[in-house]
Amino acid sequence: MKANDFRKMAEAELKQKRDELTQELFNLKFQLNTGRLENTGKLGAIRKDIARINTILTESRG
């Protein structure tokens, strides 16, 4: 997702989305380590989305 899409979301929605992405990242890392993951680029995309959400949450606090 784009940062502007995340900025339109409420804080509670952002936290929920971050939790979902963190769980998905965990599952993908597990698949990577067991050799079942085919699309390794998805790992980086999810990590970047989590970072975007964390940045937006930090901006809203300040």
UniProtKB/Swiss-Prot annotation:
<dbReference type="GO" id="GO:0006412">
    <property type="term" value="P:translation"/>
</dbReference>
<dbReference type="GO" id="GO:0003735">
    <property type="term" value="F:structural constituent of ribosome"/>
</dbReference>
<dbReference type="InterPro" id="IPR050063">
    <property type="entry name" value="Ribosomal_protein_uL29"/>
</dbReference>
<dbReference type="Pfam" id="PF00831">
    <property type="entry name" value="Ribosomal_L29"/>
</dbReference>
<keyword id="KW-0689">Ribosomal protein</keyword>
<keyword id="KW-0687">Ribonucleoprotein</keyword>
<dbReference type="InterPro" id="IPR018254">
    <property type="entry name" value="Ribosomal_uL29_CS"/>
</dbReference>
<protein>
    <recommendedName>
        <fullName>Large ribosomal subunit protein uL29</fullName>
    </recommendedName>
</protein>
<dbReference type="GO" id="GO:0022625">
    <property type="term" value="C:cytosolic large ribosomal subunit"/>
</dbReference>
<dbReference type="InterPro" id="IPR036049">
    <property type="entry name" value="Ribosomal_uL29_sf"/>
</dbReference>
<dbReference type="InterPro" id="IPR001854">
    <property type="entry name" value="Ribosomal_uL29"/>
</dbReference>
<comment type="similarity">
    <text>Belongs to the universal ribosomal protein uL29 family.</text>
</comment>
